[in-house]
Amino acid sequence: MRPAIKIGIIGGSGLDDSQILESRSEKVVSTHFGNPSDVLIEGKIAGVDCVLLARHGRNHSIMPSNVNYRANIWALKTVGCTHVIVSTATGSLQERIHPGDLVIPDNFIDRTTKRAQTFYDGNDMLVGVCHVPMEPAFCSRTREVLIETAKELGLVGVHNKGTVVTIEGPRFSSKAESNLFRQWGADLVNMTLVPEVVLAKEAGLCYAAIAMATDYDCWRDCGENVNVADVMATFKKNVTKVTQLITAVIPKIAEMDWTETIGELTKTVNGSIMLPHAY
């Protein structure tokens, strides 16, 4: 029997408008890990059950370090989500990725310092230590559907893969850091994908991201360096591409049989947990 598909959408800077949902209703959820960033907005897209959550709160009052990523992911799991699709604003570290382009990331580098990265932290609810493997980092099948849907829509400036460096923030990178990330082979820099992607995998959710390049960070010797005004202006100008892709991909995901994918993910997580034992 196929699992019932329910898709969580985590909206980042510039994409937390509940108008993309039909038959909207708000749901207050609290978790063992605290409260999520905002209420959950439940509704439908093309008849598919969806849940929208504003990562930074609907008034964008929560800085990246203070987002309760564990509560956000656990809240979506609690209400029955099988998938999570997120949007995120990023700085481009490569000339070929232009502001306004979309990237479907396939890997990450973690440069955060202050964030809880596991649900298995010694609490009474989840026993043991979870050494979850992060290859693949994102759900391969969900990424494939996003890529194919972008092609079908004829969206220009869509890159099929990319490595994202997640920094702690809220400050932007120094030029030395930006160039270091480029030397590492990174394509984008942002402040929110980690630990979100890690926690989603621990929770057994099929997670994929749509990253929008909003600027060139500060590595270039010519042109303006990243600033908030330009980031938001670029996102606002191109956000319709993100919403178009999300609304088109959701019915495609719902049509597919995810039994094996979800089963394999659950098996991976369960096999990663080391339980306490006596010597």
UniProtKB/Swiss-Prot annotation:
Coiled coil: none
Cytoplasm keyword on record: yes
Catalytic activity: S-methyl-5'-thioadenosine + phosphate = 5-(methylsulfanyl)-alpha-D-ribose 1-phosphate + adenine
Cytoplasm among keywords: yes
Listed EC numbers: 2.4.2.28
InterPro entries: MTAP, Nucleoside_phosphorylase_d, Nucleoside_phosphorylase_sf, Purine_phosphorylase-2_CS
Binding site for substrate: M191, D215, Y216, D217
Class in the EC hierarchy, top level: transferase
PROSITE patterns referenced in this protein's UniProt entry, alphabetically: PNP_MTAP_2
Pathway: Amino-acid biosynthesis; L-methionine biosynthesis via salvage pathway; S-methyl-5-thio-alpha-D-ribose 1-phosphate from S-methyl-5'-thioadenosine (phosphorylase route): step 1/1
UniProt subunit comment: Homotrimer.
Name of the protein: S-methyl-5'-thioadenosine phosphorylase
